[in-house]
Amino acid sequence: MTIGLIGRKVGMTRVFTEDGVSIPVTVLECSPNRVTQVKTLDTDGYQALQVTAGSKKASRVNKPEAGHFAKAGVEAGRGLWEFTLADNEGADIKVGAELSVELFNEINKVDVTGQSKGKGFQGAIKRWNFSMQDATHGNSVSHRAPGSIGQCQTPGRVFKGKKMAGHMGAERVTTQNLEVVRVDIERNLLLVKGAVAGAKNGDVIIKPAVKA
């Protein structure tokens, strides 16, 4: 199954097993996802479900968005996401339908995608976990410097992809094979074992695990 849900990271807590073992979990709020468009091979060249989640103030919805949501007959959400469909999947899902956290009732492992916390401009020590140079023994000013970044006249340049200082974080990060600890249908909550990338209240994409 390739259909997933759009959720929101609430935060982390822990749950206990009957034996008293503490399990760290991330709480994901999965409010019902509304289907805004069903893409087909005939009209779009591929099969996918387009969904929205949450809500957005009417004053914040521009005219193209308003028209798109009105055509689907659903309330405007905070964004639009797509789930590519496999062959013969999702044939019974129509525009306006709702997908709930109940989708994960029979699933043990999930992949969760979020945007990692932005750290701004960082040096090579923090960004790439480089070792620091000597604190003393004649070293000055170069304690947190990355060191050599290349060779001499040959090749006479710095190779692409060289690990150097730069912007860190604020990247799309997928954490794979997270165990589903609990599915709370009444409160639209999904509890997964371990950490998920991103800050609290950040949007996350939850899919059945690919490598499970």
Curated annotation (Swiss-Prot):
One GO cellular component term noted in the UniProt record for this chain: cytosolic large ribosomal subunit
**For this chain's UniProt record, which GO biological process terms are given?**
translation
Annotated keywords: Methylation, Ribonucleoprotein, Ribosomal protein, RNA-binding, rRNA-binding
Q: Which positions does the record annotate as the modified residue N5-methylglutamine?
A: 153
Q: Which top-rank group of organisms is this from?
A: Bacteria
Q: How is it modified after translation?
A: Methylated by PrmB.
Kindly give the Pfam families that the UniProt entry links to this protein.
Answer: Ribosomal_L3
Q: Tell me which InterPro entries the record gives.
A: Ribosomal_uL3 (IPR000597), Ribosomal_uL3_bac/org-type (IPR019927), Ribosomal_uL3_CS (IPR019926), Transl_B-barrel_sf (IPR009000)
Query: Example GO molecular function term?
Result: rRNA binding
Q: How does it assemble?
A: Part of the 50S ribosomal subunit. Forms a cluster with proteins L14 and L19.
Q: What does this protein do?
A: One of the primary rRNA binding proteins, it binds directly near the 3'-end of the 23S rRNA, where it nucleates assembly of the 50S subunit.
Q: State the family named in the UniProt similarity comment for this chain.
A: Belongs to the universal ribosomal protein uL3 family.
The name under which this protein is listed is Large ribosomal subunit protein uL3
The record lists the organism as Psychromonas ingrahamii (strain DSM 17664 / CCUG 51855 / 37)
**Name of the gene:** rplC
